[in-house]
Amino acid sequence: MSDLSSVLEIAAPLAGVGGLGYAKARAPRVYWSLVGMPVTWCRFTFTYRATMDVCGLTVRPSALRAFLVRNVARREVLPVPPKVRRVRGTSTGLRVTLRLPAGLEPADVAAASERLRHAWGVHSVNVVETKPGVVELRMTGYDVLSRVRMPRRRRRGPADSLVVPVALRDDGTAFVRDYRKIPHSLTLGSNQSGKSMYQRNLIAGLAKLPVGLIGIDCKRGVEQGRFASRLSALATTPDEASELLGVLVSEMEDRFNLLADHQVSDVWELPEKLRPVPLVVLVDEVAELFLASAKKEEERRDRTVTQMIRLAQMARAVGIYLEVCGQRFGSDLGKGATSLRAQLTGRVVHRVNDKQTADMGLGDIAPEAVSSVTTIPPDRPGVAVAGDSSGGWSRIRTPELTPAEAVAVCREYAHLTPRIAALAPFRPAVRPEPMPADSAPLARPVPVTD
């Protein structure tokens, strides 16, 4: 019995250490909840004031406070760090709410985020301004982008909201496409960068919403043709794309007439019974629309680019949104490229082959994010840098979604596909759903005898 007790005394700690090591490698959320979060919380609590002081995030106390500390409390007057309002643990890290003293701004804390990360031993520290004078430190305990798991709890918006969770940010929150706030977006990425995965997640999310999806895929529809059950229109050649964009411009003008008749400036101000269905135009390989090798094709290109710019400038008010994707995008594409880019507020740039494409994608809104794009490794497909016109940016990664899964979602919600008369000529043919190989036939053959 004593031998068994000795074995258990030795084996139990070894098994515990081995289990923690396995959890750290295979189940980082479990390891963080059991070990990482308590250790980091204690380290933050006991080293907060000293860390803020050495990182330059303290200010001199006011004259009144210095007088009270020196003469009433009989203590040494120390610099004042930001006041900790709240500390909250999550499955991916810590959330710390700080009240900034007079003399500090959120940019000061953001500039010291790398030093704070090393001081507290976390994977990353992101600074978000929640309201004037208050910031939130979003600490991530491990690399959440190595294995993407979307947050389970999502904020539910109103019934008419157009919010689609697409990817996971490096701070553990969901990256969403909110078409009411950011109506148009530009997504860039080279081959095998994860751009197609991003598109599949976006289409699968939009398929569940009461919107119309318009596809423009000049690769003969090899990317978007499989989603025909949920598409209201599909163009597979540059000529068809030009015709389809012309129809969309006419639809935009008709909707503006509807707004003028009811004296409103936005489609969402109309009564629900009169409100036309929102349309999301998904453009794949936008560079194909700019290419021309003959005089006739140049006329088609100029017409197509002009129509896209018109939609990007005015279509938001009537509920038509652009989602433009491509492998590369530069001013050398021709006239109208920079004008179109200026109207696309949202930017998502995956790994690209040239720095010019990264500059065109993010250089005008977040120049410091360009260097982050060029460091995306090729062995991590789906990683991208997302930014907008506010200057903020973050790294994101799209969860894996196979084409078959995206097609299944489109077939499930095919009943939401709106029937628009003007788009009827471009309605793609829907192939019947293939029958599983192991399914039994409905009718059994009967042999014919004499």
Regions found by a protein language model. Give the residues of each.
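Glycine/charge-rich, flexible interdomain linkers and switch-proximal surface loops
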Residues: K131-M139, Q263-P276, Q327-F329
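P-loop NTPase catalytic phosphate-binding loop
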Residues: M1-G36, T40, R154-H262, P276-D359, ...
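Conserved ATP-driven motor cores of ASCE-family P-loop NTPases powering translocation/secretion/packaging/pilus
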Residues: E114-R115, N126-E129, V135-L137, D143-R155, ...
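Amphipathic alpha-helical surface "interface" segments used
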Residues: V264-L279, P428-D438
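Acidic, low-complexity cytosolic linker/stalk segments
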Residues: V30-L68, A404-A406, P425-P447
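N-terminal "pre-motor" subdomain/linker immediately upstream of P-loop NTPase catalytic cores
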Residues: V35-L162, G172-T173, S331
